[in-house]
Design a protein with these regions (language model features):
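Conserved PLP-enzyme active-site core in the AAT-like
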Residues: 16-19, 29-204
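Conserved N-terminal alpha-helix of the aminotransferase class I/II PLP-enzyme fold
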Residues: 1-28
Length: 204
């Protein structure tokens, strides 16, 4: 996607979302999540993540050969839904798996539950790990007051944002946001592995 119009659109998106760079994705947030995980992990690497991640995360682990370290969120018995990852759970996983390369967080979960993202980002960075956020249901966090913190505002390294779920765009359109410490060129190479090089301009 070297087209000037697309490059300008990516720059405008990055500015709007407070990211160092934004990539326009046309394979749904599945392709965005997979690119995010494949960027962070190689074969044999460990990644800390909640048990209730989207299947696109698990499929990415199959592709790259990374090893999941699961954190089991508590369940709200009255509502019957999984909650977010507790800080104590994440800290324990980091301590027990100091060689893990990343921590992945749902921000929010399918049911709108958020973890303490700022604290988790700090714990990950203090341990030399990346922090990735699946924000398939959190696009609105970037554009409203009184809402939970967005991944980029919390200092996360990468975030997958589903524009078509909560941003009003056509189905399959998504964004992959990266922070300043992630190599833009390497991410672009990974994206070329996970989505078409002939993206629909209707989706873009």
């Amino acid at each position: 996607m070297k087209n000037f119009c697309i490059r300008e659109a990516e720059e405008l998106a990055a500015d709007a979302f407070g990211a160092a760079h934004a990539f326009l994705m046309v394979g749904g947030t599945t392709s965005s999540v997979q690119s995010m995980v494949l960027t962070a992990c190689k074969r044999g690497d460990e990644i800390i993540l909640p048990r209730n991640v989207h299947r696109s995360v698990l499929n990415a682990l199959v592709l790259c050969g990374a090893v999941p370290v699961y954190v089991n969120p508590e369940v709200d018995k009255r509502l019957g839904i999984s909650l977010g990852m507790k800080r104590e759970q994440v800290a324990k996983a980091i301590k027990e798996h100091p060689n893990a390369v990343a921590v992945l967080v749902n921000n929010p979960t399918y049911y709108g539950i958020c973890s303490d993202l700022r604290a988790i980002v700090k714990m990950a960075h203090d341990a030399g790990m990346l922090c990735l956020a699946d924000e398939a249901h959190g696009t609105h966090f970037y554009f409203g007051g009184g809402l939970p913190v967005s991944a980029m505002a919390a200092g996360a390294d990468m975030a997958s944002v589903s524009m078509h779920k909560s941003g009003g765009s056509l189905t399959q359109s998504s964004l992959l946001l990266i922070g300043p410490n992630v190599h833009q060129g390497y991410v672009r190479q990974i994206i070329n592995l996970t989505q078409t090089t002939s993206g629909s301009y209707l989706l873009i």
